[in-house]
Every structure is written in structure tokens, then in C-alpha cells.
Amino acid sequence: MNKQASQPRAIYYVVALQIWEYFSFYGMRALLILYLTNQLKYDDNHAYELFSAYCSLVYVTPILGGYLADKVLGNRMAVMLGAFLMAIGHLVLGASEIAPTFLYLSLAIIVCGYGLFKSNISCLLGELYQPEDPRRDGGFSLLYAAGNIGSIVAPIACGYVQEEYSWAMGFALAAIGMLAGLVIFLCGNRHFTHTTGVNKAVLCARSYLLPNWGWLLILLVAAPLLITVLFWKEWSVYALIVATAISLVVLAKIYRQAQTAKQRKELGLIVTLTLFSMLFWAFAQQGGSSISLYIDRFVNRDILGYSVPTAMFQSVNAFAVMLCGVVLAWLVKESVSGNRTVRIWGKFALGLGLMSAGFCILTLSARWSAAYGHSSMPLMVLGLAVMGFAELFIDPVAMSQITRIDIPGVTGVLTGIYMLLSGAIANYLAGVIADQTSQSAFDASGAVNYAINAYVDVFEQITWGALACVGVVLLIWLYQSFKFKSRALAVES
């Protein structure tokens, strides 16, 4: 084996932890909306609000998690602490089947754990390489592929266990997965001795009457309690408003920092891409909420007498991303060798167009359900797969553009703003959209009178909304192409 080309041993422990983190997170996420409506008997409106609040806040806490890792904990300790908190959160969530009061606390613990983990796992991987190490890109590709494996397997495994045993066992499996990843990671501790550890000097220094380790303990207790209150009082939207306002102030500061017209143009492009990405993900995140309940209520899931658990359908999207990503990488390689390139706006138009096509298929499925009572499973799988393929033309394109910006020291900040808007705000908007399908008519026996027309209307509106975005993006693409050709002709003349 060529030692120059082989990856450092530590990466395999990071990859194992990433697989199990994705397994834990996406296994629980596949069950959550179904658990709220089918087990805890929340009405759709309440379930959508809580689900979107949870999915929004997991994109806000990594900002604080990254800060704590940089200043005090170091990436390795932050990742381990985050993994432990997520495992505890999933176990407490399982207990909420018996004691529903634990629900908000469990979600808050998971959000805090995710904040410590998500922002620092990539940074930990980066510490394994020198800045110019040619193996770096391969290591990050391996980490991304590993995550997809976890997100494919998780809904299948957790969905099966929940269906065959109980909701608590389904959530417990997610917790066991996270603990398994943590144990594997700890077994490779000797390979991480060169990475940044806990900053003991800062940790032991005193600030405002207490040593910093005391403030850290207070934060670890207070943060879950504060987020619990946000869930309980439905105040998470205020946290998003504050975070967004701060981001806009920071964005304005970056704009003033730009010294050339080229830099301002690049920043304007990133902002525009971020806004379209936010809309894209507001549509795409229906997969965990309104689409999941639609599948549960109106799709025929029987195969040879076996009823496929609804949660398993969450694997379709992840599988499509992984499979189509390999195909797309080959096609792009071929197009580059033939001197053919795809413009940024062309890719965004294609991604939004595929999202529109996916929801068009779901609209057909919903109309089929309206006519015949239930829709076919293959049609549903096709729609989800097309939506998964669409993702490949959005985030990678936007993130690539962010890393190219020529303003020193702003890449990390812009990435955080992008994740806030396309993650947190998009998930909040997704909840607003999903709420249009809410089913609130309970009869005396407690059964719900599900109205298929609500799903038909929402899926159709998203189809046209995504198509309208395609139209706007194509206009931008045509304008940019015209400007480029005009400039080229002017140079030739």
C-alpha cells in the first residue's frame, strides 16, 4: 500500500462515529412526526409546530457548539459530549411514551447534543491533515458517504423495530446506535493525541466569581432547560428571529468589508443563491412531516401481505442522493473532459425543476388517493427519489460558491448564515406549509376524518411554487448569459 496515499488511521473512527450519528439522528427523525400524531395523539397542527421547531433549532445550536469547541473544549471533546447528549436524549424520548412530560426535555437535549456534534465533526476531521495534504478531499468525501449509509439504514431499522415492538424500542435503537458509535470512537483515542484537546488554562480561569468550568456546567444544564421552555411555550420562532437579525447585521458588515466590485458581486450571488436554497429546502423538508403523514394515511404499503412501515420511506431520499451522486459525478467528469460546463444558475434551475417534478408526481399520487382511496407505493417512491436527486444541484453548488469568495476570513461566517437560512428558517417555513394539510376533525371515537384534498392542494401549490422559482432562476441565467456574450463581443470588436 502507498503510505502517501493511504488515509490516517484516525479517520476510520471518525467515519464510524459519523455513520452512527446519522443512524441515530435520522432514525429518530423518521419516527418523530408519526409518534406525535399516532401515539401521543397530537393534532396535526401541534405536531407540525413541534416538528418544525425541533428541526429549526438543530441548525441554530451548532453556532454555539462551534464557539465552545474553539475556545474551551476542542473538537474531540465537543464531539464526544455531543454524541453522549444525543444518546441520552433519545433514551428520554423513548420514556415519553409513558411520561409525555419528558417529550420537550428529550428534544431539547438532542438539540444541544447535535449543536456540539455537528459543527465540530468536520473540524475534527480537518485536524487529521496538514493544510496542503492531498488526502484531505478524499477524507471529506469518505465522511459524506458514511453519513449517507447511516441515513439509509436508520429509517429501515428503527421503523421495523418500532412496528414490531414499540415506539420506545425504536427510539432506544437510535440511542444504542449513537452509544455504539461513541464506544468505537473511544477505542481509537490513541490516534487523536495530536488533535487539539481541552484548553485547561481557559477552563480553569475565573470569570465573574466562578471558574469557566463552572460556567460550562451551568450552560450544559441551563441550555436544555431553556430550549425545553422554547418548545413548551412555542417560542422557538423568536429565537429564529433574533438569530436571523444578527445574521443580517453580520452580512451587512461583510458587505462593507468588500473592497472591490467583484467581491460585492460574489457576495450578492451567494445571498441570492441562499434565498433560493431556503425556498428549496422549505419544499424538500415536507418529507419528514406532511409527506410522511400522507404516506401513513393514504398510500397502500402492502407487499405480499407485509405492511411496510411508514418510517422506511425516509430511506428513499437518502438512497437516491447516494446513487445519483455517483452517477452525477461520472457525468460531470465526462462533461469536463469534453469542455462542457454547467452554470451555477443552470444547476439551480435543474434542482428546483426536479423538486417541482417530484411534487407533481406526489400530486398525481394524492389525486389517485382521492379517486380510489389509496395510492400506489411505486408512484410514491418515484416522487421521493426525484426529490432526492434534486438536492444534488442545490447545497453542493451554493457551498462551493461560498468557498470561492475572495473576501478574507468570511467563509466560515457565510457558511453559518447559509445553514441558518437554508436549514433553520427553511424548516420553520416547511412547518408553515405543512400546517396547511392539518387534519383537526376528530369524531367521538377519537378517529380522524382525514381530508385528502388538503394534501392535493398543498402538493400542487408546491409544484407550481417550485416551477415559478425555476422561471425566475432561468431569467437570471439568461440575463447573465446575455451579459457574458455581450462582453465577449465587445472584447472581440
UniProtKB/Swiss-Prot annotation:
Supply one GO CC term from the record: plasma membrane
Q: How does it sit in the membrane?
A: Multi-pass membrane protein
In terms of InterPro entries, this protein maps to: AA/pep_transptr_DtpD, Dipep/tripep_permease, MFS_dom, MFS_trans_sf, MFS_Transporters, POT_fam, PTR2_symporter_CS
Q: What does this protein do?
A: Probable proton-dependent permease that transports dipeptides.
Instruction: Give the highest taxon in the source lineage.
Output: Bacteria
One term of GO molecular function: peptide:proton symporter activity
Task: Show the taxonomic lineage.
Answer: Bacteria, Pseudomonadati, Pseudomonadota, Gammaproteobacteria, Enterobacterales
Q: Which UniProt keywords apply?
A: Cell inner membrane, Cell membrane, Membrane, Peptide transport, Protein transport, Transmembrane, Transmembrane helix, Transport
Q: Which SUPFAM superfamilies match?
A: MFS general substrate transporter
NCBIfam families xrefs: PRK15462.1, yjdL_sub1_fam
Segments passing through the bilayer: 14-34, 49-69, 91-111, 138-158, 167-187, 212-232, 235-255, 267-287, 312-332, 344-364, 379-399, 413-433, 458-478
Please state what the protein is called.
Answer: Dipeptide permease D
Where does it reside?
Cell inner membrane
HAMAP family reported for this sequence: PTR2_DtpD_subfam
Please state which protein family the record places this protein in.
Answer: Belongs to the major facilitator superfamily. Proton-dependent oligopeptide transporter (POT/PTR) (TC 2.A.17) family. DtpD subfamily.
Q: Please give the organism.
A: Salmonella choleraesuis (strain SC-B67)
A GO biological-process term: protein transport
